[in-house]
Amino acid sequence: MTSNSGSTALRDARRIVVKVGSSLVTNEGRGLDEAAIGEWCRQLAVLVQGGREVVMVSSGAIAEGMKRLGWRTRPHEVHELQAAAAVGQMGLAQMYETKLRENRIGSAQVLLTHADLADRERYLNARSTLVTLLGLGVVPVINENDTVVNDEIKFGDNDTLGALVANLVEADALVILTDQKGLYTADPRKDPQAKFVHEAAAGDPALEAMAGGAGSSLGRGGMITKILAAKRAAGSGASTVIAWGREPDALLRLVRGESIGTLLVAQTAKHQARKRWMADHLQLRGAVTVDAGAAAKVRAEGKSLLPIGMTGVSGEFSRGDVIAVRDADGVELARGLANYSSVEARLLCRKPSSEFERLLGYVAEPEMVHRDNMVLMRG
């Protein structure tokens, strides 16, 4: 099925997560493919210089480590895989740093585990760092921290990580670059009747039946992981494109509105998806009461909540917990992720940010709840 929605999903995307797999990043297992990485970095630079924000999720550390260690086949022992990841991550980060710098774009290395994103405080810290980097025009290059996490090496995949990062930074779109042109109704290598899927709804159960299962010996995921990643990304309102990574100027053509690969469309708008997630799936831990001025800014303008506008704190909560923002009449205006614990919040009520360091000994954020981590409940 095709439609015009594909022409706008990437064209209108301001914040994009790009995931590239091992089979593309590496030169048939003989270390990193410098030319390919250089080409993607050139395209990333054009996107950033054009006003877009881009996060790169890249596989390749283990494959590069295998090459540097002289290993011809992927080992099975976890500690050997972790050793390869540690060795290879050095080269992977250096390659991206070099190629992005050649295009006058800064880069940053970020290693994450699923546990980092499952813990709300670490989630908030990771989000703040990534959003800051994007605001600086830097391209964060993210990989799983395979060296310290056994389960990710055994069962994880960077398709899932790409979707989690898309959720984390509230991306408008996820682009998964792979060694196939997209999704087919069956394996085209085995079934001559297989038809290419240009567009479908992310999360459609029929997609999982279509997807092939096995990946290459270098990587960890087949097409099924990409289908599930698109479903996860759609949960926060991000549409996903699965496309051939060697397609000339694939990223640039996608943002121009060209139809490349398979588009899996999120069925829920980004703000609506985030509001539903925060309102329905995270337990409310406490609340802050705000004065009339702060209430007006939150309600009418969707502004961040500053501690100077807070008049009271109820409940016991930690940084990263979900709290309610209420006006003087007890009406719930919004919900959001707290940047400070309840103990700290009580100290910060009615205080300007200039006094935070004196009161707490540090400054985490100037806001109690940032507008990017807040959803309005009324109005």
UniProtKB/Swiss-Prot annotation:
GO MF entries: ATP binding; glutamate 5-kinase activity; RNA binding
An example Gene Ontology CC term for this record: cytosol
Known pathway: Amino-acid biosynthesis; L-proline biosynthesis; L-glutamate 5-semialdehyde from L-glutamate: step 1/2
Organism placement in taxonomy: Bacteria, Pseudomonadati, Pseudomonadota, Betaproteobacteria, Burkholderiales
Name this polypeptide is given: Glutamate 5-kinase
GO BP term (any one): L-proline biosynthetic process
Family membership: Belongs to the glutamate 5-kinase family.
Annotated organism of origin: Variovorax paradoxus (strain S110)
Role of this protein: Catalyzes the transfer of a phosphate group to glutamate to form L-glutamate 5-phosphate.
Residue span(s) of domain PUA: 285-363
Positions with a binding annotation for ATP: K19, T178, D179
Reactions mediated catalytically: L-glutamate + ATP = L-glutamyl 5-phosphate + ADP
Enzyme's top EC category: transferase
Coiled coil: none
Keywords of this entry: Amino-acid biosynthesis, ATP-binding, Cytoplasm, Kinase, Nucleotide-binding, Proline biosynthesis, Transferase
Locations listed in the record: Cytoplasm
The encoding gene: proB
Amino acids binding substrate: S59, D146, N158
EC number(s) recorded for this UniProt protein: 2.7.2.11
Listed HAMAP family: ProB
